[in-house]
Amino acid sequence: MAGEKAPAAKPDATKKSPAKKADHARGKAKKKTLAEKKPKKGKPHCSRNPVLVRGIGRYSRSAMYSRKALYKRKYAAPKSRIERKKKREKVLATVTKPVGGDKNGGTRVVKLRKMPRYYPTEDVPRKLLSHGKKPFSQHVRKLRASITPGTILIILTGRHRGKRVVFLKQLSSGLLLVTGPLSLNRVPLRRTHQKFVIATSTKIDISGVKIPKHLTDAYFKKKKLRKPRHQEGEIFDTEKEKYEITEQRKVDQKAVDSQILPKIKAVPQLQGYLRSVFALTNGVYPHKLVF
């Protein structure tokens, strides 16, 4: 109708102002950055191969291969030998050189690696490389941190097992030089392996003790006794050669023990401790003992 005004258009609720759009975009960007920062956590699951006994699973290796569908994985095929040979550059063994003269053919094939001019008259054996392996004499000798000079050790094997001894030093072969002393527990100067001893927390200060330099591995090496040969008329009279302690051993034993005994006597109850023999009784567990 004439004179009437058209109703004003209502603002669209779905449309947003530019300021609100900018805030919305910022919020989305923040959410994206937070999502990127947080690593996706996979769902924890137990093994597909339940354990029957410790170290033994329910399914075999071939069964697990099919259960895990490992056959679907794609592996790069290894390069064939022919492809490897193609890539390798051939090292030339000979070179062709020009030669002067009309009747010499123009070129000559010459070896790059020339043969020796002289040969040895006798065959000399060559020493083969051992590829980093060293002989036993050059092996690194390591010592347990608990074993230091003056430590009381408990011997676990041999004729003196269970006895307590004093550690003196480590020899070049890696064996330990120990002594009883002889007057306390009848253990002489002898070698023993660090595998077969228990290091106790009891220690003696032997920094002032002078150990003879000739007490080496060669000194303690056992000499082979000669076997008696049967001769006519002496079949029953022959006797086996017996091992006898040399005078040098006796002198060295006294020299070392005379220096260690005063230091043992200075500590109360240490003499009785060295005389006693280590043994386990009922209810005593070695892994729970503090030595």
Swiss-Prot record:
Q: Which UniProt keywords apply?
A: Acetylation, Cytoplasm, Endoplasmic reticulum, Isopeptide bond, Phosphoprotein, Ribonucleoprotein, Ribosomal protein, Ubl conjugation
Modification N6-acetyllysine, positions = K242
> Its family?
Belongs to the eukaryotic ribosomal protein eL6 family.
Q: Where is this cross-link: Glycyl lysine isopeptide (Lys-Gly) (interchain with G-Cter in SUMO2)?
A: K5
InterPro entries recorded for this chain? 60S_ribosomal_eL6 (IPR000915), Rib_uL2_dom2 (IPR014722), Ribosomal_eL6_CS (IPR049633), Ribosomal_eL6_KOW (IPR041997), Ribosomal_uL6_N (IPR005568), Translation_prot_SH3-like_sf (IPR008991)
Tell me the segments the record calls region Disordered: 1-51
Per its UniProt record, what Pfam families does this chain match? Ribosomal_L6e, Ribosomal_L6e_N
Mention any one GO cellular component term assigned to this protein in its UniProt record: rough endoplasmic reticulum
UniProt biased composition (Basic residues):
27-46
Residues annotated as transmembrane: none
Assembly state and interactors?
Component of the large ribosomal subunit. May bind IPO9 with low affinity.
Residues modified to N6-succinyllysine: K97, K210
Q: Where is the composition biased (Low complexity)?
A: 1-11
Query: What GO biological process terms does the UniProt entry carry, in alphabetical order?
Result: cytoplasmic translation; ribosomal large subunit assembly
Q: Where in the cell is it found?
A: Cytoplasm, Cytosol; Cytoplasm; Rough endoplasmic reticulum
Q: Which residues carry this modification: Phosphoserine?
A: S130
Tell me which species this is from.
Answer: Oryctolagus cuniculus (Rabbit)
Q: What is the role of this chain?
A: Component of the large ribosomal subunit. The ribosome is a large ribonucleoprotein complex responsible for the synthesis of proteins in the cell.
The name this protein goes by in its record: Large ribosomal subunit protein eL6
User: Spans of biased composition, class Basic and acidic residues?
Assistant: 12-26
What GO molecular function annotations does the UniProt record carry, in alphabetical order? RNA binding; structural constituent of ribosome
PROSITE patterns per the UniProt record, alphabetical: RIBOSOMAL_L6E
